[in-house]
């Protein structure tokens, strides 16, 4: 996968290129990350990239010209077919389905805004899509870009040590993940669920699915509205709800 980044703080992305899953993907040649700083494309000696917005008001805007030239330079370093993404509070909210869609492009240029945003003329002429990582305010698009890069990298074949991890993660199947445990078997008086120690793979699979369904029902019930549950999933969810309600009643 090829990713071009347009950012006035390119050094922030060393964390992506040097560490964790994304860092390993870069070392394996599965992920290429290149940065272009709009300041290098400014037409004045102060390398100015921002200015006051027309109409007044607080804050500054990133100017169109340095960003536009940086985008065009990034496009010159890859083949055709690259999609330009602006990380923006006004964009479509990112979810796992959106990650799948974006990762399918293979080549992306990510625009990291700053200040109050960017000149609208750049959005209308150069941006293919706007994406948001949530309904909250950040100081810039760099962190949003890192989140997007990390989530997409997990879908690249060979990026994870265990390919099944990407399938079993929360949201990969539209559900939250089930609880997980590691050694020791008993810690501070808390025991690992016996089914996980049984070695019975079918029972373990059913337990994990039931816990995943139940956790989603408890914490993010709206996610279930978007899913078509199988007969097995409906049965397991009802079992979880029955057991949960009995537990609550016993504690009253």
Curated annotation (Swiss-Prot):
GO cellular component: cytosol
Main localization category: cytoplasm
Enzyme Commission number(s) from the entry: 2.1.1.228
Molecular function as annotated in GO: tRNA (guanine(37)-N1)-methyltransferase activity
Binding site for S-adenosyl-L-methionine: 113, 133-138
Subcellular location: Cytoplasm
Cited CDD domains: TrmD-like
Biological processes, Gene Ontology terms: tRNA N1-guanine methylation
Pfam families named among the record's database cross-references: tRNA_m1G_MT
Enzyme class: transferase
SUPFAM superfamilies for this protein: alpha/beta knot
Reaction equations catalysed: guanosine(37) in tRNA + S-adenosyl-L-methionine = N(1)-methylguanosine(37) in tRNA + S-adenosyl-L-homocysteine + H(+)
Keyword field: Cytoplasm, Methyltransferase, S-adenosyl-L-methionine, Transferase, tRNA processing
Subunit structure: Homodimer.
Purpose: Specifically methylates guanosine-37 in various tRNAs.
NCBIfam families noted in UniProt: PRK00026.1, trmD
Family as reported in the entry's similarity comment: Belongs to the RNA methyltransferase TrmD family.
Protein name (Swiss-Prot/TrEMBL): tRNA (guanine-N(1)-)-methyltransferase
Organism: Baumannia cicadellinicola subsp. Homalodisca coagulata
Upper taxonomic lineage: Bacteria, Pseudomonadati, Pseudomonadota, Gammaproteobacteria, Candidatus Palibaumannia
Name of the encoding gene: trmD
């Amino acid at each position: 996968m090829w990713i071009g980044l347009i950012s006035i703080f390119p050094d922030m992305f060393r964390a992506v290129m040097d560490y964790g899953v994304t860092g390993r993907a870069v070392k394996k040649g599965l992920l290429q990350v290149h940065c272009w700083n709009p300041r290098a494309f400014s037409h004045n000696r102060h390398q100015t990239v921002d200015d006051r917005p027309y109409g007044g008001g607080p804050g500054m805007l990133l100017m169109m010209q340095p960003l536009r030239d940086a985008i065009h330079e990034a496009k010159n370093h890859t083949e055709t077919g690259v999609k330009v993404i602006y990380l923006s509070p006004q964009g479509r909210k990112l979810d796992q389905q959106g990650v799948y869609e974006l990762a399918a492009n293979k080549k992306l240029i990510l625009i990291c805004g700053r200040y109050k945003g960017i000149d609208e003329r750049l959005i209308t002429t150069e941006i293919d899509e706007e994406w948001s990582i949530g309904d909250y305010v950040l100081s810039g698009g760099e962190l949003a870009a890192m989140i997007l890069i990390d989530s997409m990298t997990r879908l690249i074949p060979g990026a994870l040590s265990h390919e099944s991890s990407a399938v079993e993660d929360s949201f990969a199947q539209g559900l939250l993940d089930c609880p997980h445990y590691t050694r020791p078997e008993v810690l501070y008086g808390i025991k690992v669920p016996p089914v996980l120690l049984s070695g019975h793979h079918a029972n373990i699979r059913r337990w994990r699915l039931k816990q995943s369904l139940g956790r989603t029902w408890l914490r993010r019930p709206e996610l279930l509205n978007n899913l078509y549950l199988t007969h097995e999933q409906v049965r397991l969810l009802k079992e979880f709800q029955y057991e949960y309600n009995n537990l609550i009643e016993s504690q009253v």
